[in-house]
Every structure is written in structure tokens, then in C-alpha cells.
């Protein structure tokens, strides 16, 4: 960023203050020209790393989910359709007999690895359900005795508010205790805890009865096994899905079959056991969600580029299911939200109508019924941020609604997981378009939970929820890229000194080069993009210094002189430059343009130096026009202002030359195409509008016009700055959404890798202007150090 506020902020940071040369530049001085190819850093091609990649690739074929003791026990209670005296699924009972823990519980492996004290309610519920199943059929008396002993010892956990409470626990667990009494099981339970538990059940049922909402009806149907004779099961069956299940829940479906003997319920249970063997998961089917979770994790951890073939296959399959209206997507809110977000961000044409209907059903509709938790609400919120079209007003409304719900969860302190709490706060503080890629990925890696699980009526895990191989590869890749970035920063430091830029008196910019490079490394980080990062960073610093000449320190003669020098190009700087300052600026600019142009020539197979010169001249002329307007007190129309201001925001020299260095060939026809210019204008307008909002008071005091002041003038001066800010922000929202739509457009003239750079810069400007006081000093210092200088060191390795 090049405007005053960024420069002033940077100049105050002790980290960025620089003398004649920094320690890095001093050690590198005189060592030759900056390197334009990626430094040689240890690659990720070792046999061990390749084996890790192979194991990750196999995750796409393992469509598995952890077995649920709780659900398996309920399926085990199902009687044979031919005889109520015999179990329909004896294999489930044998599985229970074989999987009791030494302490008498029926905990699963993830219960032990995931802070067991927080999952005791889940373990109690699973253990009691297993006891009921065995007792019903007169099996495993020794197992039952051990299980009862465990329940008696740990019963206090049933009312412990510090532990994670499974969905419906306060109704289902007491109901199972009643069922235990019916089966003549003698439980010696603490009477105080038991009374407390029963009171909670009564209060919860009373609340649900008085509420009477459709959402409550869905909730009670989902926990149907805990309602027993209180349920009108015929009414509950309206939630039955095409696969025969109720909510894709084996336990609810088993309870429904026990009550009604519905043949489709039995078909569903048979299909689940056919797929998983002797035990069932907590949710089935979950294939689409599981696959999308792998894709999402790979993208969030920064290693998706290693699995492009597998990811493409998942996305194609998901898109096909989306178009077919597959229940696995549209009957599960989390899956729908993740599918909508992933497909949209990967360029698939998915309308928001179906997604909006799922959101509405999830929170208010009586049909077909969706169960939700904070994870689901967060997933829906992230998906609802992806507004691309002007007509998506309802999507915007749902985004506001979901945001409000998450804020309530956050302020109410109801999120029991500290990690989830942090995720929600991050999502609310930083919208997806105001997050620098590398910052987000580092945070994801550092907070990645290899023992992650989800909890509805019971907890469950997927291979993609917490995977050591994903974490291992992402850490190695991050640290490798970071080592390359540190080497590039040293080269950048050397370039700064070799071009004598440290001699200029506006020394506040001697520090800005750290930020100029950081913005590139934090957005497009892959090793092969080294040339593009260096072009971005060098041109960013040059625009900052040129902007300072035009806006702060230069005379009109110096400004005109610099423009003339660039136009003439082949000049004798010792005689043609009006000042030492102009001589240094022009010499550095010329050398940088030639360096970037030469490297781009090698990649593109044609000369593009003249185009880079034109890009710079466009910027210089637009800056000169602003100076002349201010000098002559000329008041442009809004159209006149905009046509000049988006260029003068100075993103052209930063982004446009770098497009030639990201890989794809860019023909002259492409760079002259309207799509190319639309991408540039939309990106630049976002920065310009946000800058004008931030700089309104300062520029107003200086007698300078911007979009804010012109908007107020065009409305007769009758609207307040606050109203104008709302209008300009709305304008910016439209520009940003249109930019993202173009970037994601599949049929495009400009290659996707090039379009991504426009979006990366858009994210940079939105991050800087996300807070009312900007990207403040201490946070910037911390982030730069983390992303560039601090490797990830985790105790897992």
C-alpha cells in the first residue's frame, strides 16, 4: 500500500527503522545483482515425505468414520422382525462384548485421547446404552456388572457443567435410566445427582413443550430414543429420508423401528451394517462430508497443490451430487455449507437458492429437519460470506443472521471448546476477504488438533478431522517455503541498498520494504513463484517512494522531470535529472523495470518491458493529474475522479508486471482484453474506496477531494460523513463481489493463476482497512515476525 496512512504507521515501528543499511543488507552489500530464481532449499522429495503424501492420497479412498458404541448399542436393541424375543443384529452385541474397556466403560479411542474428563457424559451415555442392549437379550452378565460399576463411580459427571454435553443428553440419559429400571438393572446411584438429573430432564421437556417451535420439534424427533412413549412416532416419520433413516442417525432410526417396525428403517440399518460390519457410526452416510473435509483441510493447511488430481475428482463428484439434489448434501446443513463454499471458491456454478433453503430449514422450517451445533453454524456462516451476484440479497440476510447467532454464542460463553471459540472469533473479526493466506495457514497449522472430534448425540471422528500426516506435511512445507522467503527478503534488502534508496531523505520508507515483501510472501507463497514475489515487492516499494515524491516531498518540477525521464527512457541521468532524489528514483525504477522485464521475457517468450513502462507512466500521469487538480482547486465529477483515482492508487505496477511471472503465457491480446482491465479496475477501486474512507478527515483538512467528499458534495452537503461511509462501503462491497466473481469465473480469457493475484491484492487492502484504526503497529510487527522469521515447531514431532 502506498498512501500516507500506511507509510506513517510503518515509520513508527522500531522493527522497521533503518540506518544507512540494515545488518542483513550490510552483510550482503557488494555481492552482485539480486537473484531472480528461487533459492536452493531442501526439497520435499525425500522418501519419507513421499510416503506421507501417499498416505494422505489414500485418505480419499478411505470413506470411513469412527464406530459409535452408542449407536451400535441402540441397533443391537432392535428385535428381529420375525421374533421379538431374538435380536435382529446379534453381531452388534458380539461387537459390544469384544469392545468393553478394562475400566468397565464402552469408551472409544478418541474418548481417551481427547481430554477424557470433558467427554465423560458421552462415555456414560455409550456405556449405559451398551448395558441396556446386553441386558435386553440376556448376554454378558460379567460385562454388565463391570459397566454398572463404572457408571456408579462416574455418575457425578452426568450433571457436571464443565464437561461437554452431547445433544439431548439431559433427556436421553434419564430415559435410559428409566429403561434400565424396566429391565431390572440395579443401579446404586447418588440420589442427589439423580434428582438433579431428573429435574434437568423435566425442565428441558417443559421448555421444549412451551417453545413449540418447528426447530424444537425437529430436536425432539432427533433424540427420539430418549422420548419413548411420549413420542408420536407416526408424526416423527415425516422426517424419514429416502435412504430409510431418520436424520442419517442409526440410533434414532433403530428406536423408530423398535416403535413402528418400519421396513425402510430396517433397510437403512442393514445397509449401514453391510458397509461397516458389526458396528455402525454416529452418522451414516457421511461420504461427501468426509471427502470435502479432506479437501478443506488440505487447502487450509496450504498443501492442496500436492493433491490437485484427487481434489478435482472430489469436487467433480460433489458438483454432480449437488446438481442431482442429493440428500446427503441437502439434508445435512454442515455438508451443504461446506459443499457450497468449496464449490464456489473453486469456480463451480452453484446458485445460492438451494443453500439458502437449507439455512432457513435449519433454523426455522418444520421440514425436513436439520440438526445443528456451533460447528454447523460456523460452517454456514463461512459459506454465506460468498456473495457474488447483486441479486443475492437473501444470502446477505442469512449472513447477517448467522453472524448474529455466532456473536450470541461467543458472548454467552456457551462454546465449550477453546479451539472452536477461537475459530468463531477469528471468523467474526476477519471476513474471508480480509485474511492473508499465509497468516491464516500458519494459524491453522499451529492450532490443528490431531485428536479432533465432533459431537452430536455422541462424539465421532473422521480420518480428515485430525490427521498426523496432514500436519506433518504442512509443517515441513511451511518451513521450507519460509526459508525461501527469508532468503528472498535478504536479496530484497540487498537490492534496496544497491539502488541507493537508503540515501533518500524520506527515510520512513526505508522500513516499508519489509511490508512490501511481506504482502507478497503472505499471499502467494509457493517456491516457484519467487520471481513474482520479488517483482511485486520491488515495484511496491518503488510506488511507495514515488507516491511520497508526488504527495509529500517533491516539487512540481521534480514530478514533471521524473515523468519526462521515464518517457524518454534512454537518458544521461547525470545531466537530465533535476535533483539527486529524482536521479536515485529514476535509476532504481529503470533498473527494476529492466530486471523484471528480462525475467518475464524468458518466461513469456516475448518482450514485455514496454508494457511495464506504460503501466508506470499511467500511474505517474494519474498522480500528476491529482497534483494539478489540487493546485488549480478543480472539482472533478465523480466519474472523472474515479477514472483517474483507481489508477493513482498505484496497484498497477505492483500487480500487473507480476502476472507475467506466475507461470501462464499472457498474450498481448489478453492484456488488451476488457476482462484484464475490469479485473484491474475492480481491484484498484476496492483499495481506493477503502483508502478514501480512512483518509477523508485528513484530506478534507488538507483541502483535497476524494470519493467521500465528492459523494457528500453531490448530495448537496446534506448527508453526514457517517451516511457517506455506509454508501461508499456498500459501493466497495459491490466492487469486491464482482471481482471475486470474475476471478472464479471458469470460462475466462485471463488464466486463473493470474486472476488470483488480483484477489490476493484485494485481500491485502481489505486486511489493512479491516479495523477502524488500520492494521496497527504491534500486530503488524508480530505478524511479520511470525510469517517470515518464526518457523513452526510443534511438540508432535
From Swiss-Prot:
Which positions bind Mg(2+) 1? 547, 551
Give one GO biological process term.
miltiradiene biosynthetic process
Q: Which residues bind Mg(2+) 2?
A: 547, 551
Q: Which Pfam families match?
A: Terpene_synth, Terpene_synth_C
Keyword Transport assigned to the entry: answer is no
Domain of life (superkingdom): Eukaryota
Plastid keyword on record:
yes
Chief place of localization: plastid
How the cofactor binds, per note?
Answer: Binds 3 Mg(2+) ions per subunit.
Q: Where does the chain bind Mg(2+) 3?
A: 691, 699
**Entry-linked SUPFAM superfamilies:** Terpenoid cyclases/Protein prenyltransferases, Terpenoid synthases
Q: Which InterPro entries match?
A: Isoprenoid_synthase_dom_sf, Terpene_synth_N, Terpene_synth_N_sf, Terpene_synthase-like, Terpene_synthase_metal-bd, Terpenoid_cyclase/PrenylTrfase
Q: Where is the composition biased (Low complexity)?
A: 21-32
Q: Name one GO cellular component term.
A: chloroplast
Q: Where is this region: Disordered?
A: 21-47
Q: Where is this motif: DDXXD motif?
A: 547-551
Catalyzed reactions per annotation = ent-copalyl diphosphate = ent-atiserene + diphosphate
Required cofactor names: Mg(2+)
Intracellular or extracellular location(s): Plastid, Chloroplast
Q: Which pathway, metabolic or otherwise, does it act in? A: Secondary metabolite biosynthesis; terpenoid biosynthesis
Location of the transit peptide in the chain: 1-48
Entry's transmembrane regions: none
EC identifiers of the protein: 4.2.3.185
- Gene Ontology molecular function terms on file: magnesium ion binding; terpene synthase activity
- Function summary: Involved in the biosynthesis of ent-kaurene diterpenoids natural products such as oridonin, miltiradiene, eriocalyxin B and nezukol, known to exhibit antitumor, anti-inflammatory and antibacterial activities. Catalyzes the conversion of ent-copalyl diphosphate (ent-CPP) to ent-atiserene.
Protein name, UniProt field: Ent-atiserene synthase KSL1, chloroplastic
| Species per Swiss-Prot/TrEMBL record | Isodon japonicus (Scutellaria japonica)
Q: What is the lineage of its organism?
A: Eukaryota, Viridiplantae, Streptophyta, Embryophyta, Tracheophyta
Amino acid at each position: 500500500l502506498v498512501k500516507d496512512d500506511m507509510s506513517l504507521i510503518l515509520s513508527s515501528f522500531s522493527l522497521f527503522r533503518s540506518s544507512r543499511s540494515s545488518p542483513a543488507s550490510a552483510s550482503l552489500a557488494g555481492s552482485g545483482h539480486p537473484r531472480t530464481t528461487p533459492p536452493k532449499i531442501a526439497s520435499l522429495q525425500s522418501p519419507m515425505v513421499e510416503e506421507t503424501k501417499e498416505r494422505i492420497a489414500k485418505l480419499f479412498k478411505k470413506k470411513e468414520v469412527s464406530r459409535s458404541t452408542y449407536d451400535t448399542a441402540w441397533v443391537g436393541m432392535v428385535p428381529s422382525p420375525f421374533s421379538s424375543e431374538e435380536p435382529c443384529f446379534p453381531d452388534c452385541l458380539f461387537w459390544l462384548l469384544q469392545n468393553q474397556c478394562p475400566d468397565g466403560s464402552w469408551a472409544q479411542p478418541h474418548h481417551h485421547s481427547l481430554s477424557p474428563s470433558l467427554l465423560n457424559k458421552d462415555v456414560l451415555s455409550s456405556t449405559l446404552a451398551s448395558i441396556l442392549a446386553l441386558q435386553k437379550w440376556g448376554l454378558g452378565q460379567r460385562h454388565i456388572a463391570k459397566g454398572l460399576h463404572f457408571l456408579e463411580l462416574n455418575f457425578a459427571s452426568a450433571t457436571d457443567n464443565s464437561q461437554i454435553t452431547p445433544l439431548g443428553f439431559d433427556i436421553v440419559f434419564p430415559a435410559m435410566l428409566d429403561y434400565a429400571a424396566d429391565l431390572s438393572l440395579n443401579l446404586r446411584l447418588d440420589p442427589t445427582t439423580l434428582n438433579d438429573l431428573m429435574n434437568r430432564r423435566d425442565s428441558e421437556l417443559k421448555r421444549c413443550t412451551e417453545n413449540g417451535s418447528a426447530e424444537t420439534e425437529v430436536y425432539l424427533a432427533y433424540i427420539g430414543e430418549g422420548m419413548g412413549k411420549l413420542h408420536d412416532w407416526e408424526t416423527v416419520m415425516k422426517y424419514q429420508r429416502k435412504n430409510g433413516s431418520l436424520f442419517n442417525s442409526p440410533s434414532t432410526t433403530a428406536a423408530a423401528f423398535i416403535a413402528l417396525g418400519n421396513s425402510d428403517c430396517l433397510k437403512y440399518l442393514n445397509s449401514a451394517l453391510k458397509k461397516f460390519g458389526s458396528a455402525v457410526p454416529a452418522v451414516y452416510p457421511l461420504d461427501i462430508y468426509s471427502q470435502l473435509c479432506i479437501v478443506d483441510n488440505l487447502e487450509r493447511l496450504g498443501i492442496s497443490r500436492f493433491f490437485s488430481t484427487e481434489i478435482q475428482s472430489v469436487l467433480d463428484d460433489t458438483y454432480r451430487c449437488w446438481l442431482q439434489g442429493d440428500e446427503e448434501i441437502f439434508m445435512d446443513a454442515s455438508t451443504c455449507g461446506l459443499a457450497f463454499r468449496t464449490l464456489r471458491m473453486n469456480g463451480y456454478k452453484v446458485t445460492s437458492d438451494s443453500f439458502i433453503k437449507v439455512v432457513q430449514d435449519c433454523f426455522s422450517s418444520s421440514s425436513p429437519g436439520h440438526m445443528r451445533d456451533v460447528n454447523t453454524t460456523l460452517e454456514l456462516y463461512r459459506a454465506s460470506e460468498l456473495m457474488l451476484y447483486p441479486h443475492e440479497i437473501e444470502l446477505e440476510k442469512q449472513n447477517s443472521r448467522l453472524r448474529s447467532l455466532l456473536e450470541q454464542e461467543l458472548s454467552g460463553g456457551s462454546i465449550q471448546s477453546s479451539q472452536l471459540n477461537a475459530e468463531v472469533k477469528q471468523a467474526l473479526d476477519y471476513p474471508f476477504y480480509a485474511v492473508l493466506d499465509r497468516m491464516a495457514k500458519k494459524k491453522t497449522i499451529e492450532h490443528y488438533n490431531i485428536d479432533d472430534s465432533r459431537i452430536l448425540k455422541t462424539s465421532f471422528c473422521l480420518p480428515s478431522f485430525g490427521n498426523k500426516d496432514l500436519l506433518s506435511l504442512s509443517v515441513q512445507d511451511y518451513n521450507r517455503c519460509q526459508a525461501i522467503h527469508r532468503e528472498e527478503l535478504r536479496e530484497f534488502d540487498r537490492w534496496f541498498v544497491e539502488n541507493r534508496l537508503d540515501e533518500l531523505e524520506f527515510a520512513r520508507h526505508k522500513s516499508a520494504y519489509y511490508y512490501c515483501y511481506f504482502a507478497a510472501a503472505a499471499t502467494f507463497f509457493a517456491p516457484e513463484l519467487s520471481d513474482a514475489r520479488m517483482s511485486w515487492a520491488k515495484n511496491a516499494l518503488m510506488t511507495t517512494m514515488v507516491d511520497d515524491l508526488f504527495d509529500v516531498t517533491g516539487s512540481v518540477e521534480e514530478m514533471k522531470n521524473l515523468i519526462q525521464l521515464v518517457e524518454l527512457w534512454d537518458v544521461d541521468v547525470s545531466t537530465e535529472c533535476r535533483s539527486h532524489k529524482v536521479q536515485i528514483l529514476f535509476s532504481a525504477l529503470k533498473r527494476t523495470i529492466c530486471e523484471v522485464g528480462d525475467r518475464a521475457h524468458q518466461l513469456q517468450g516475448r518482450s514485455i518491458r514496454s508494457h511495464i513502462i506504460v503501466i508506470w507512466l499511467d500511474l505517474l500521469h494519474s498522480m500528476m493529474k491529482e497534483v494539478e487538480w489540487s493546485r488549480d482547486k478543480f472539482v472533478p465529477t465523480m466519474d472523472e475522479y474515479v477514472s483517474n483515482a483507481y489508477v493513482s492508487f498505484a496497484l498497477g505496477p505492483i500487480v500487473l508486471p507480476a502476472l507475467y511471472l506466475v507461470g501462464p503465457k499472457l498474450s498481448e491480446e489478453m492484456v488488451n482484453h476488457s476482462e484484464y482491465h475490469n479485473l484491474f479496475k475492480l481491484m484498484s477501486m476496492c483499495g481506493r474506496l477503502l483508502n478514501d474512507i480512512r483518509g477523508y478527515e485528513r484530506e478534507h483538512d488538507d483541502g483535497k477531494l476524494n470519493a467521500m467528499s465528492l459523494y457528500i458534495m453531490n448530495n448537496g452537503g446534506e448527508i453526514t460523513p457517517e451516511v457517506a461511509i455506509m454508501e461508499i462501503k456498500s459501493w466497495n462491497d459491490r466492487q469486491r463481489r464482482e471481482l471475486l466473481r470474475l476471478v472464479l469465473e471458469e470460462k475466462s480469457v485471463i488464466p486463473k493463476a493470474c486472476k488470483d493475484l488480483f484477489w490476493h491484492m484485494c485481500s491485502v487492502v481489505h486486511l489493512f482497512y479491516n479495523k477502524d484504526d488500520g492494521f496497527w503497529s504491534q500486530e503488524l510487527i508480530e505478524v511479520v515476525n511470525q510469517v517470515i522469521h518464526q518457523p513452526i515447531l510443534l511438540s508432535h514431532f
